[in-house]
């Protein structure tokens, strides 16, 4: 059963039984104290969730403490000798608990009542926090266990003041007196025998940490009442009140305690039965130790005193009986991280951790031991599964091209992979083709060499292991190799294997394929392909040692989006979103079924046949768990391939030979229609910076990430982040063949940081692939305002100069101001940008060096007149108002604009409307201003009817004659504001 619902951490089927026993006991106790409650085990929480009964009981305990102190004072007992007297002090100091008797269930008044009770428990009774509960635990039924444990503790404290106690508390006090009597009789030397709270319970007492902590002999905390009420009240006339007036209810068919214990112990299936020796009535010695446990019957439950609390004997045996412990609480041998690769995964991006799967290797459950393979000697047509406790999983036959005949063979995955993977030789004379369904690669490994050669297309070089990491991996591998006892089984997407004896059959690894210590081949018979296909170890509830991180077992009806979280699809969705910004992956994972992806990969392998012939040593890496040294062992092969491709990798940098890379990519585009994935490992830091750039694209490379494709000369689709789901190689031929790599910039060989002139992102943060481009504005649909110098060019919406972006220079430093290739945005704050034109720079320098306003005005006048004269001589007589607001490529302003600025400065801002250079212009829309800005940056504006557009873009003062005479400063033109 899939672990979708919230479950307690304890993995055993009997783990809730002790709570049921406690609930029954507390319900009977409260029903005796408060008959008007009509409480029983079924409506236990419903009767208490208003908090009224709890607050009443708190006041009842306070009254009992008052009576207790009065009795002690009447007998002239010392108030300091008793621990219980010390407990009574804080209770009396607090006063009564206030509550609203008419509170309804679920209301805030009920919450207030419950909160007052919890505060009273904490401050008056000094109950430790681990035994308290929260308001929601009772109101919302979030944690019934804590409510029960807290009420048991309250009952213990009340029993010290002479109140009626539940049966469990009475039995606790009886056991404590029995232990104290034994110690008095035998002396302190006997204490070495101890009780049930010894080392056996130190690691497992979390299953039954229900009450306070006791020592191995006499309780030495708040319950050490050797001279307290239970001895002093022995002479009272009603001692029964201490231990409850109710006799024990017999619901066990009059079986004695010993018979019930014997019945439970007899369920042991060990070769030699788990010993439980009766010492005296209710006292047993457990196992082969000297540990004594105290057993009592509580209605139909056999209870064991554990660590200051109670557990059921069946649950206790589940934890300590070796056969039950192994059957239901399987110990973890080792853990392994399996990166789950999607078919269109670009391996140079590193390991995709968002879909990685953690596999805890442990012994198989009892359910799996039933299905032992009857034949350990497989014929030549099939593999063999031999070894104790191994499931024979039937294997579907495969065709020669690698297509599996079983459509569901890739869906079911074993959760008990081997700690030891044995790859076998593929015999050349066998002629068999081994196909791993659910994975896309084939493994060919020489076991004698022990090296796993990885192809460059799947090697993960972006995560360089440290020497310490390599040492740890070697230690772990040696420890795993030494673990040879017990069955082994491959993971779900395991590598396919063939028999080492040259069998001619075809083996396919499907689901949980098991191999014994001999490790020879693939298990099962081909006849019953679906017989054991969906076997998983969910028959035993999984413990809390991290197994829940495996997620849901894949089945035909349920498919989890992600296997990395415990049970939440929200985690999967959020991680899918986080994948867009993670530094490990830039290609979105494919969510297609495994069998479809396998088919497509096999088609790609058919298309790439000539590559396989040309390079015989192109071994592939399986999708299964890989140890890092095994991958790194093929480093010399990888470096040879990288150097052939023009990529030279050292410890400090990655150098790309552009000429070689271009030749290689052109040859690939011409000879092979399938675009190869990148073989250049990329630094996560560079990717993070690259994605932090606010986006804008310009034409080229089909609108893909030009800063990546132009640098390495690789086809653009290999780098697009929002790549469509990989369907088939043949459908991608057109885009792959038509994409031409853009010539890279010259001085970009040893860096991966995006340059200012290479940034090709979009405004909204997405990358625009070739199919998503907007239709360009051509000459017949858009008339650009020109200055009459060049031929008409097409309008480019996503030019480099039209976005606000965070840019980095070749040293990795952030470029603050607009560079020559990229101006500032129209919408960015002018305060945050440095001036980018020479005139503005000189004006700022002049203003900073001047002492007062007069000097500033003088310097500005001289600068402006100098620039005006220079521009007039350059522009000549033919300069008209057409290019009034144009900025030339050298950043200087045109004469019309200079006249306006000069007049404004000379007149100290008191510029008359008649002196304006143009009639009032309408406010430009965003589209027109963006168009003119883009055209001003691309200095290829053609001749045309640009006079109207040019004159319309000169900004005049915005008020009428009778209004303010000071014009609004125009930051687009001056760039000073």
Swiss-Prot record:
Keywords: Cytoplasm, Cytoskeleton. Expressed in the ovary and the ring canals of the germline cells. In larvae, expressed in the notal region of the wing disk. Residues 399-428, 436-454, 577-589, 666-677, 731-741 have a biased composition (Polar residues). GO terms for molecular function: actin filament binding; microtubule binding. The keyword Iron does not apply. SUPFAM superfamilies: Calponin-homology domain, CH-domain, GAS2 domain-like. Residues 928-953 have a biased composition (Low complexity). Residues 20-159 form the Calponin-homology (CH) domain. One of its GO terms (biological process) is negative regulation of Notch signaling pathway. Residues 218-245, 397-543, 557-624, 666-685, 693-803, 910-977 are annotated as: Disordered. It is found in: Cytoplasm, Cytoskeleton; Cytoplasm, Cell cortex. Residues 502-527 have a biased composition (Gly residues). Residues 221-236, 601-620 have a biased composition (Acidic residues). It holds the Pfam family GAS2. Essential for development and viability. Required for ovary development and oogenesis, and is essential for the development of the indirect flight muscles. May act as a negative regulator of the Notch signaling pathway in certain tissues, such as the muscle precursors and ovaries. May function as a linker protein between the actin and microtubule cytoskeletons. Belongs to the GAS2 family. Named 'Picked eggs' based upon the mutant ovary phenotype. This is GAS2-like protein pickled eggs. The lineage of its organism: Eukaryota, Metazoa, Ecdysozoa, Arthropoda, Hexapoda.
């Amino acid at each position: 059963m899939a672990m979708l619902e919230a479950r307690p951490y304890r993995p055993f089927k009997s783990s809730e039984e002790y709570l049921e026993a406690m609930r029954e006991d507390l319900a009977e106790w409260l029903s005796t104290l408060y008959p008007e409650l009509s409480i029983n085990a079924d409506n236990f929480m419903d009767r208490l969730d208003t908090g009224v009964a709890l607050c009443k009981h708190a006041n009842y305990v306070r009254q009992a403490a008052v009576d207790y102190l009065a009795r002690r004072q009447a007998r002239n007992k010392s108030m300091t000798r008793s621990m219980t007297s010390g407990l009574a002090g804080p209770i009396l100091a607090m006063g009564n608990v206030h509550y609203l008797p008419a509170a309804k269930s679920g209301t805030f008044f009920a919450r207030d009542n419950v909160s007052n009770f919890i505060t009273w428990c904490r401050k008056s009774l000094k109950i430790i926090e681990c035994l308290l509960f929260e308001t929601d635990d009772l109101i919302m039924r979030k944690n019934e266990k804590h409510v029960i444990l807290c009420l048991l503790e309250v009952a213990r404290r009340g029993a010290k003041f002479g109140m009626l106690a539940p049966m469990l508390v009475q039995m606790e006090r009886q056991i404590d007196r029995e232990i104290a009597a034994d110690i008095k009789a035998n002396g302190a030397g006997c204490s070495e025998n101890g009780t049930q709270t010894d080392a056996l319970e130190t690691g497992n007492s979390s299953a039954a940490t229900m009450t306070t902590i006791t020592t191995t002999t006499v309780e030495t905390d708040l319950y050490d009442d050797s001279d307290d009420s239970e001895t002093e009240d022995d002479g009272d006339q009603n001692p029964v009140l201490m231990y409850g007036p109710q006799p024990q209810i017999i619901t066990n068919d009059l079986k004695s305690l010993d018979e019930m214990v014997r019945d439970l112990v007899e369920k042991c299936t060990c070769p030699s039965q788990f010993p439980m020796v009766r010492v005296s009535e209710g006292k047993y010695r457990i196992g082969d130790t000297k540990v004594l446990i105290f057993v009592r019957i509580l209605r139909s439950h056999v209870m064991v005193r554990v660590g200051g609390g109670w557990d059921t004997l069946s649950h206790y045996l589940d934890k300590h009986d070796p056969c039950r412990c192994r059957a239901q609480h399987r110990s973890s041998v080792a853990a392994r991280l399996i990166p789950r690769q999607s078919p269109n995964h670009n391996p140079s991006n590193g390991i995709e951790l968002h879909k990685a799967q953690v596999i805890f290797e442990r012994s198989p459950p009892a359910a799996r031991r039933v299905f032992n393979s009857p034949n350990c000697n497989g014929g030549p047509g099939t593999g063999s599964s031999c070894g104790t406790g191994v499931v024979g999983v039937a294997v579907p036959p495969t065709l020669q091209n690698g297509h599996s005949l079983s459509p569901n063979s890739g869906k079911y995955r074993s959760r008990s992979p081997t700690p030891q993977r044995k790859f076998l030789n593929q015999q050349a004379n066998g002629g068999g083709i081994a196909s791993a369904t659910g994975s896309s690669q084939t493994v060919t490994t020489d076991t004698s060499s022990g090296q796993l050669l990885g192809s460059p297309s799947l090697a993960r070089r972006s995560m360089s292991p440290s020497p310490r990491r390599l040492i740890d991996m070697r230690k772990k591998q040696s420890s795993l190799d030494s673990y040879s006892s017990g069955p082994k089984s491959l993971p779900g997407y395991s590598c396919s294997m063939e028999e080492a004896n040259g069998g001619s059959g075809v083996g396919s690894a499907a689901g949980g394929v098991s191999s014994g210590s001999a490790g020879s081949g693939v298990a099962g018979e081909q006849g019953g392909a679906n017989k054991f296909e969906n076997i998983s170890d969910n028959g035993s509830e999984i413990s809390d040692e991290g197994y829940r991180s495996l997620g849901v077992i894949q089945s035909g009806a349920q498919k989890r989006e992600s296997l990395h979280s415990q049970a939440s699809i929200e985690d999967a969705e959020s991680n899918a979103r986080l994948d867009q910004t993670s530094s490990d992956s830039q290609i979105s994972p494919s969510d297609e079924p495994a069998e479809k992806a396998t088919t497509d990969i096999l088609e790609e392998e058919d298309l790439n046949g000539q590559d396989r012939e040309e390079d015989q040593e192109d071994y592939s890496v399986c999708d299964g768990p890989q140890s890092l040294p095994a991958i790194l062992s093929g480093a010399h092969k990888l470096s040879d391939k990288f150097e052939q491709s023009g990529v030279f990798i050292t410890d400090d940098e990655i150098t790309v030979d552009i000429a070689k890379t271009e030749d290689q990519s052109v040859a690939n585009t011409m000879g092979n229609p399938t675009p190869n994935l990148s073989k250049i490992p990329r630094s996560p830091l560079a990717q993070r910076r690259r994605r932090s750039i606010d986006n804008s694209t310009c034409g080229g490379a089909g609108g893909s990430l030009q800063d990546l494709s132009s640098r390495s000369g690789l086809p653009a689709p290999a780098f697009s982040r929002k790549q469509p789901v990989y369907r088939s190689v043949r459908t991608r031929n057109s885009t792959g063949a038509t994409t031409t790599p853009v010539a890279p910039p010259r001085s970009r060989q040893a860096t991966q940081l995006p340059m200012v002139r290479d940034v090709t992102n979009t405004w909204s943060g997405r990358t625009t692939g070739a199919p998503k481009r907007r239709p360009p504005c051509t000459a017949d649909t858009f008339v650009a305002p020109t200055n009459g110098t060049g031929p008409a060019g097409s309008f480019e919406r996503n030019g480099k100069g039209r976005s606000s972006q965070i840019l980095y220079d070749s040293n990795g430093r952030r470029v603050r101001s607009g560079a020559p290739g990229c101006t500032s945005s129209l919408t960015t704050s002018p305060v945050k940008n440095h001036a980018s034109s020479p005139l503005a720079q000189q004006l700022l320098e002049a203003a900073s060096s001047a002492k007062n306003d007069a000097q500033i005005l003088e310097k500005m006048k001289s600068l402006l007149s100098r620039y005006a004269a220079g521009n007039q001589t350059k522009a000549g007589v033919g300069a008209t108002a057409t290019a009034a607001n144009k900025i030339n490529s050298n950043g200087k302003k045109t004469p019309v604009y200079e006249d306006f600025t000069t007049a404004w400065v000379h007149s100290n801002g008191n510029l008359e409307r008649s002196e304006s250079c143009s009639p009032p212009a309408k406010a430009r829309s965003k589209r027109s201003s963006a168009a003119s800005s883009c055209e001003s940056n691309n200095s290829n504006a053609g001749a045309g009817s640009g006079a109207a557009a040019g004159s319309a873009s000169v900004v005049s003062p915005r008020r009428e004659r009778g209004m303010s005479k000071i014009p609004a400063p125009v930051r687009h033109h001056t760039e000073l504001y």
